[in-house]
């Protein structure tokens, strides 16, 4: 895990794909293996290339609400219950920058398309939400989790993370406190039985 900045622009070069691509997968932190701010985290991997990886923690709500965040950027959000939704801790990199993971993907000025989802970093998606015509489902974070070239692969080799194909329902519909066990259940794992000695799927 690194605190270095990561370019969020998708690269069209097919040669940039890593041997094992973890894009559109969940990383589930293994007990005793992942420490610090990412302990106990479920991370949705938005982009993974030979240059590194970018993901968002999806199970760490903060005390900041969307209404408060919108006020900071001079937008008014009056839609309930959206305005009371929490902003999430997305990771330790660029914690002053907002990231919006949403569905449907829509057409915004700075987005990475992820199948039916998109990661948008431009203000226009928040303006659309304020206007009442934003994406139907979204998760807003401050910060992201970033890895340099080969770092994620190294952590996987050390069994720091379990991996499983991402489920949008867990991202958007499951209560934050239940997302870690829900992600484990995708692998058929009971959280109570999980130990630090297992490998990745």
Swiss-Prot record:
Protein name, per record: UPF0301 protein Bpet0561
Disulfide bonds: none
UniProt source species: Bordetella petrii (strain ATCC BAA-461 / DSM 12804 / CCUG 43448)
Family as reported in the entry's similarity comment: Belongs to the UPF0301 (AlgH) family.
SUPFAM superfamilies: VC0467-like (SSF143456)
Coiled coil: none
Entry GO CC: cytosol
Record-linked InterPro entries: AlgH-like (IPR003774)
């Amino acid at each position: 895990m690194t605190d270095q900045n990561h370019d969020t622009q998708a690269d069209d070069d097919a040669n940039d794909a890593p041997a094992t691509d973890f894009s559109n997968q969940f990383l589930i932190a293994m007990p005793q293996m992942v420490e610090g701010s990412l302990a106990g985290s479920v991370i949705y991997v938005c982009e993974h290339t030979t240059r590194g990886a970018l993901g968002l923690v999806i199970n760490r709500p903060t005390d900041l609400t969307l209404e408060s965040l919108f006020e900071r950027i001079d937008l008014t959000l009056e839609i309930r219950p959206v305005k009371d939704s929490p902003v999430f801790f997305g990771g330790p990199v660029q914690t002053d920058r907002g990231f919006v993971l949403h569905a449907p993907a829509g057409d915004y000025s700075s987005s990475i398309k992820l199948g039916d989802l998109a990661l948008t970093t431009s203000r226009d998606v928040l303006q659309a939400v304020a206007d009442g015509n934003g994406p139907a489902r979204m998760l807003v974070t401050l910060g992201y989790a970033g890895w340099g070239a080969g770092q994620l692969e190294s952590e996987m080799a050390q069994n720091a993370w379990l991996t499983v194909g991402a489920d949008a329902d867990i991202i958007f519909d499951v209560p934050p406190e239940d997302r870690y066990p829900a992600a484990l259940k995708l692998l058929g794992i009971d959280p109570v039985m999980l130990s630090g000695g297992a490998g990745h799927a």
